[in-house]
Amino acid sequence: MDNAPKTFKVDRHKQLVPLNPGLETNFVCSFEIKSLDGKPFQTTIVEQGQIKPTQYREVDDGFISGQLEGDGTPRSYFLVLRAQEPCECTVKIVLSPKQQVQPHQQTHQQSQQTHNKTVANSGDPPPPPPSQPNKFLKPKWIVGMVIGVVVLYLLYRYRAQLMDKLNLGSKTPFSKN
């Protein structure tokens, strides 16, 4: 990438400066921003999908520098500049590829990352809860069995009352009349 400083006219409107053009994924980006006349300005870093920056950093002395590291996911990052009073800012961006880790360190780092993801899952939806083994006595089964027993009892009782009514009307040798 061209490391030559670029000058931007900054005012109340947001000025976007791409930090990783070409969707670099594993990179280290160092940047320096300096207003030519030392006027204060505001800056922040946003991702491509982020429309409105949430918080700007006030630069009162007219100079700021920083560093951004890509985490391996394809995202575009932008430097956002704005100022209450119009000024010119010089931006120097140095983009370099991130150094590869040795295999032993990489496996240790991956296990550490998976441990960190399980401890604090930032931004990702939470994993589904572990499935529980099927129990025979689930609450819905218990309620269903209780209802079934009650229905059988009521049918038995109704049948007994019906038989008593039918037996009263008929005369049998065992009845007393």
From Swiss-Prot:
Residues passing through the membrane, by range: 141-158
Protein origin, superkingdom: Viruses
Disordered, as annotated region: 100-135
GO CC annotation: membrane
Keywords: Membrane, Transmembrane, Transmembrane helix
Subcellular location, record wording: Membrane
Topology of this chain in the membrane: Single-pass membrane protein
Listed Low complexity bias regions: 100-115
Statement: the UniProt record of this protein carries the keyword Transmembrane helix: yes
Protein name per Swiss-Prot or TrEMBL: Uncharacterized protein 073R
Organism: Invertebrate iridescent virus 3 (IIV-3)
